[in-house]
């Protein structure tokens, strides 16, 4: 009652294996997790007096290990997992602080570093209205926190979720990946991967036999191509469709943060300083027509309608700085910043490409069921996808297939037939016969 608004952070996956506790009647309820102090230093932290662990004393943003150690004698701390429940009163105060005083103009006001630091019995900042709000801190029972805020975390968090199941008796397929940290989805790949390709993510992409991959790489959005490309370790590729027929090439480094003046040696791009990147390619700031005070806003990513030229540009920007044709294409091309790419991307083309790859993937997973996760997927979702993509119903499996796999096969066939408006009872009966 009165707690009507839930705010959840968009770059985390929260998993809980136990029922939630009762929610107290306060203005702000925040969920937290007991975590290793080193992890807490990268996030917000709720600090509570050991005598009143359910009441927020104050909040810190990315505290140091020394700060946490100093507090540990008298206080407990929980890491903020980004799930807050606010009362109507708390929302009114938040909205008021988000406007310029005396106007209806939007002002910058951060939920965590502004609003959060003014909460608690001994808040870090003074704000009379926010300071008066009552706050409760709830540990998430059996909670797990997976952060997807960086490129590296995209892989590490997915790997951690994948490794939740290690019991081989619960895994139907017999395929063993060359490295557990290899993830390929909605893609067509023709390269042979090995244990050296650790921390590799390929999504919505065509990676042909002319590619040579390394480790610590994320490849997204690459259209069908015939490129010969040698991608260095730690170098990622993102191709984004623009307009009706163009693409923009956005290579980047796995740990690039996309901020900083282009003149500063501390501004990194593709794992090196941006100044060094320009020097190796014999270009200067005068060749960048636009902002150079911040990498996120600098127009350095070329646009082209030619798939062949797209590959040449990628090679020049990543591994072949002396590729003359690449430099000429880059200098002539219209170029966009990372901000402009986000604003102008043609998402319909992006999703259409993904759907085409996904359609082929469904067929491959079904045909290669012995070495894929196909029959351990959500069969309801799989049936919906087969009907949506107008795919043929999977054939009845042979008798030498594992009994449980054959049961799943029959039930999937039954569900697809029903969704198509056909009779699926015989398939259901066959599944139940296999249970006997």
Regions from the PLM with identified roles:
Residues 6, 12-19, 28-38, 65-70, ...:
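Left-handed beta-helix
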Residues 340, 399, 404-406:
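Residues that mark the junctions of alpha-helical repeat units in TPR/alpha-solenoid scaffolds
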Residues 348, 372, 380, 429-435:
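TPR/TPR-like (Sel1-like) alpha-helical repeat modules
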């Amino acid at each position: 009652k009165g707690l009507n608004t839930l705010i959840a952070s968009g770059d985390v996956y929260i998993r809980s294996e136990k029922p939630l506790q009762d929610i107290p009647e306060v203005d702000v309820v925040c969920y937290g997790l007991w975590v290793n102090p080193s992890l807490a230093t990268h996030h917000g932290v709720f600090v509570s007096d050991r005598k009143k662990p359910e009441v927020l004393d104050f909040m810190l943003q990315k505290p140091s290990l020394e700060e946490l150690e100093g507090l540990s004698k008298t206080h407990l701390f929980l890491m903020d997992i980004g799930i807050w429940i606010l009362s109507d009163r708390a929302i009114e105060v938040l909205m008021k602080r988000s406007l310029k005083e005396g106007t209806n103009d939007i002002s910058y006001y951060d939920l965590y570093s502004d609003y959060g630091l003014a909460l608690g019995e001994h808040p870090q900042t003074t704000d009379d209205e926010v300071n008066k709000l009552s706050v409760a801190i709830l540990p998430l029972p059996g909670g797990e926190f997976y952060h997807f805020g960086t490129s590296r975390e995209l892989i590490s968090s997915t790997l951690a979720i994948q490794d939740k199941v290690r019991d081989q008796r619960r895994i139907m397929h017999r395929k063993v990946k060359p490295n557990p940290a290899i993830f390929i989805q909605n893609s067509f790949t023709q390269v042979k991967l090995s244990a050296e390709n650790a921390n590799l993510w390929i999504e919505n992409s065509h990676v042909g036999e002319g590619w040579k991959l390394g480790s610590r790489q994320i490849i997204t959005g690459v259209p069908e191509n015939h490129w010969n490309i040698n991608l260095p370790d730690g170098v990622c590729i993102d191709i984004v469709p623009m307009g009706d027929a163009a693409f923009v090439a956005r290579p980047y480094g796995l740990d690039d943060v996309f901020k900083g003046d282009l003149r500063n040696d501390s501004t990194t791009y593709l794992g090196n300083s941006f100044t060094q990147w320009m020097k190796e390619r014999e270009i200067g700031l005068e060749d960048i027509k636009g902002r150079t005070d911040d990498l996120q806003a600098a127009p350095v990513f070329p646009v082209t309608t030619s798939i062949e030229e797209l590959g040449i540009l990628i090679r020049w920007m990543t591994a072949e700085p002396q590729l003359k044709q690449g430099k000429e294409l880059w200098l002539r091309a219209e170029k966009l910043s990372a901000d402009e790419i986000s604003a102008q991307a043609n998402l319909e083309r992006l999703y259409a490409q993904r759907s085409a790859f996904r359609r082929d993937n469904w067929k491959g997973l079904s045909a290669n069921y012995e070495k894929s996760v196909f029959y351990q997927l959500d069969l309801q979702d799989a049936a919906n996808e087969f009907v949506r993509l107008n795919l043929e119903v999977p054939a009845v499996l042979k008798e030498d297939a594992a009994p449980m796999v054959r049961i799943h096969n029959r039930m999937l066939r039954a569900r697809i037939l029903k969704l198509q408006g056909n009779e699926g009872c015989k398939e259901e009966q066959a599944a139940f016969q296999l249970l006997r």
